[in-house]
Amino acid sequence: MAGFRLTTKVQVSGWRFLLRRVEHAIVRRDTRMFDDPLQFYSRAVFAGVVVSVLICLGAALMAYFKPLGKQGSDQLLVDRTTNQLYVMLPGSNQLRPVYNLTSARLVLGNASNPVAVKSEELNRISKGQSIGIPGAPYATPTGTPASQWTLCDTVAKPDSSAPKVETSILIRTLAIDSGVGPIRADQGMLVSYEGANWLITEGGRHSIDLADRAVTSAVGIPVTAKPTPISQGLFNALPNRGPWQLPQIPAAGAPNSVGLPENLVIGSVFRTATESDPQHYVVLPDGVARVNNTTAAALRATNSYGLMQPPAVEASVVAKIPEQVYVSPLPDQPLDVLLRQDSPVLCWSWQREPGDQAPKTTVIAGRRLPLPANAIGTGIDQIGGDSTVYIEGGQFVRLQSPDPRVGESMYYIDPQGVRYGIANDDAAKNLGLAGPVNAPWQVVGLLVDGPVLSKEAALIEHDTLPADPNPRKVASGEG
């Protein structure tokens, strides 16, 4: 055998060494070969070949055990050609076309995603009637949970005989600045609803009789003030804080019997001198009561009983008289009444952050909606409702109705601002919804109401979908 060995191992090794040296000369322009970095290149090529072979082998195994476009054991399928959704009901060998992914998940009881299958594969399986919830959202994605819910009225042409009111629902964080912000304690706004006049303050709404100039002048409402209308939704959201009218004083005008001068009859106002501002009192049948400046002004404007100014009485005399309580709803100081011409936007905002024991409500007024600049014009003008909705993604909410007899309810609000009732916790879990945020019914109740999302509703068969009873033609220029 030795006669057939034309080269030796040493010769082969030397030949390979010379090849590497030539390679160094060409690539590195150096034949000394103090180091050999080129050896890593060959190793990288070898490693790449190995990885490629492993990937090809894995793809071949996956294609064999789980071929693409085959049904397998999956129950939620989608046609790769038409994107039609199908479900295979448990215990059935029929495919059921389903209207939306929401219905499919409710039927199957989990939040799985559809598997794409070839049309040829689906055509080999028998099919039944379509099932699902007509009008349900295709899916139930959620955005950033909203902790602030706001209802706004914007009055157009407030000086006209019939001002127009536009309602907006803001399910997002507000942008407060010098142009729009909370009403201060010393501010108010005059509005009307169904023929009645109301004064809006930081705490809510107060009914007020504009013909009672004794009260209106005392609280700072000018004679030229004109109430502007508000929507039913905003009226219901603003809490009723009671009427701004003076309580009647029994036996007003009769002589007092508490030891005051004769000119101070029951119902009259006097003052005591103090180091700061004078303290006003009103005479009652069985004593005297402290009143603030606006109440004193309103009482005197109603009937001053011939007194040009409130008489001054020594504090030592007043101290001997029984002190009673005269309950007046009027503020301590006259208000700065905001005009709708300057502040056409009026809002009620509800906010409850995680950990808060109770929600915080705020009355907001200003020249524009409290939205950031990039959100202006992004509202959804609902067809079935009277509002424009500004919302950041879908919301899963749990709300407490103002009526304690109703109890709690869960809703999913889709990115179009439509609310859908969630039947129970199981339905929410099957839709992939968790961690509902708190929301006020005063705002949620104004959204367009969609169907209830439940398994029972999703298991209803249909020949065809009913027509929309309230369609709207696409605006010109959009289609």
From Swiss-Prot:
A GO term, aspect molecular function: ATP binding
Lineage: Bacteria, Bacillati, Actinomycetota, Actinomycetes, Mycobacteriales
Residue intervals passing through the bilayer: 45-65
Domain notes: Has a discontinuous central core of beta sheets stabilized by a disulfide bond that is flanked by 2 structural domain repeats on each side; the protein forms an elongated 'S'-shaped structure.
A single Gene Ontology CC term: plasma membrane
Cytoplasmic membrane side: 1-44
Species, as recorded: Mycolicibacterium smegmatis (strain ATCC 700084 / mc(2)155)
InterPro entries per record: T7SS_EccB (IPR007795), T7SS_EccB_R1 (IPR044857), T7SS_EccB_R3 (IPR042485)
Structural repeat C2/4: annotated segments: 392-447
Sorted UniProt keywords: ATP-binding, Cell inner membrane, Cell membrane, Disulfide bond, Hydrolase, Membrane, Nucleotide-binding, Repeat, Transmembrane, Transmembrane helix, Transport
Disruption phenotype: Increases efficiency of DNA conjugation when disrupted in donor strain. Loss of secretion of EsxA and EsxB, but not their expression.
Protein name: ESX-1 secretion system ATPase EccB1
Region called Structural repeat A1/1, residue ranges: 75-127
Positions on the Periplasmic side per record topology: 66-479
